[in-house]
Amino acid sequence: MFKRSLIAASLSVAALVSAQAMAVTGGGASLPAELYKGSADSILPANFSYAVTGSGTGKNAFLTNNSSLFGTTGTVHYAGSDSVLSGSELTTYNSNYNGTYGPLIQIPSVATSVTVPYRKDGNTTLNLTSAQLCDAFSGAKTTWGQLLGTTDSTPIRIVYRTGSSGTTELFTRHLNSICPTRFATNSTFTNARLPAGGTLPSNWVGVAATSTVVSTVKATNGSLGYVSPDAVNINSNAEVSRVNGNLPTQANVSTALGSVAPPANAADRADPSKWVPVFTNPSAGYSIVGYTNFVFGQCYKDASVSTDVRAFINKHYGGTTTNAAVAAHGFIPLTPAWKSAIVSAFYTGTSENLAIGNTNVCNTKGRP
C-alpha cells in the first residue's frame, strides 16, 4: 500500500526521457502520481506520459497547450488536478480555444483525503480538532503546549507545499470553512494563509513535492504537515493525526463523501464545473476530503489519441478493473453511479453530443 518516495521522485525524470515516444502526453497533480504512473499497479496505459508538476502547472499546461511545462514538446492531451477549474479558467479556455480545440471535459478520477502527518516525540495518538488545525497552520499557536493545553515548549514546525498544489487547495478549503479570517481557499499555501503573502515563521519548511512532505516531517520533532493518503499509513495514528476523532481511513472518507449524485440534467452534464463536487466541512467521517480529477479534450486531431483516451475512460470508469489499485494507494474508487454517469456522458453517449470524438462536435475541431 505504501509507495516510497524514490518512485515518486523518478516520475518527472521518466516523463522527460520517454515523452517523445509517448502517444498521449499529460501531467499535473502529485497527489495521485504513483497511482497514475511508476508503480506496478499504476492505472494509466503504457503510452500515456505523466509529468509530476503540481495541479496548477498541470492545469496551465492543458489550458494553454504548453507542453514545455511538462518538459516536452507537442500537444498536451490531458491533465491531472486536485484543483478544480475555476470559472475564469473555463471562460478563458472557451474564449481562446473552444472554437478550434473543442470543449474540455473535467471529471473526478478518485476520491481522496488530505492526511496530517506529524512527529511529536512521546505522542502516538494525536487527535486535532479543525480549530486546532487552524491554530497550528495559521501560526496563531506556535508551541505544542499552546496547541494542546500543556506546558510543552516544543515549537510547531509546519511543513507546507510550495507552488500551486491541489492538495493545498483541498486542505485550505476545509480550513477556510472553519477559520475564514485566517485562511482563504487557494492552491498556493502562502496565498491561502491570510494575509496572503504574509511572513511565515522562520522554522516552517516549504517543500515542492508530495514525496518530500513525509520525510521532512519525520526528520524533526514537532513537525506537522499535510499530504496525500498514498504517502502514509492511513490506518496508523502514530503516523497521521486523527482529525475530530477520525483517522483518514477509506471507511471514514467514504462516510464524509456521503451520497452526492452526479449531474442529473443535460445542462449540468455539459458544464465541466458540475462534475466535481467540493467538500468544505463534512458532517460525518473524516473532515478533509475531495476528488482528484482528470481534464481531457473532447476532440483530438490525432484519431489514435482520441481512441486511446476513450479506451482509458472505458477501462477506468466502465467497471471495477482499477478499483483494487485505487484502494491500494489509499484512495476511494468512484461509486457505480458516478462511473456509469461518466461513461454514459463521455464514452457511449450520443444524444447530448458530449462523448470524446463525437463527430457532431469534433468534425472540424481538435487539439492539434
UniProtKB/Swiss-Prot annotation:
Induction: Contradictory; shown to be induced in phosphate poor media. Does not respond to decreased phosphate.
Major enzyme class: hydrolase
One annotated Gene Ontology cellular component of this protein: periplasmic space
A Pfam family reported for this protein in Swiss-Prot or TrEMBL: PBP_like_2
Catalytic activity of the protein: a phosphate monoester + H2O = an alcohol + phosphate
GO BP annotations listed: protein secretion by the type II secretion system; protein transport by the Sec complex
UniProt superkingdom: Bacteria
Subcellular location: Secreted; Periplasm
Keywords: Hydrolase, Periplasm, Secreted, Signal
EC nos: 3.1.3.1
Signal sequence coordinates: 1-23
UniProt xrefs under InterPro entries: PBP_domain (IPR024370), Phosphate-bind_PstS (IPR050962)
A molecular function (GO) term: alkaline phosphatase activity
Summary of subunit composition and partner proteins: Homodimer.
Family, per entry: Belongs to the PstS family.
Protein purpose: Has both a phosphomonoesterase and phosphodiesterase activity.
Protein name as catalogued: Alkaline phosphatase L
Species name: Pseudomonas aeruginosa (strain ATCC 15692 / DSM 22644 / CIP 104116 / JCM 14847 / LMG 12228 / 1C / PRS 101 / PAO1)
Organism taxonomic ancestry: Bacteria, Pseudomonadati, Pseudomonadota, Gammaproteobacteria, Pseudomonadales
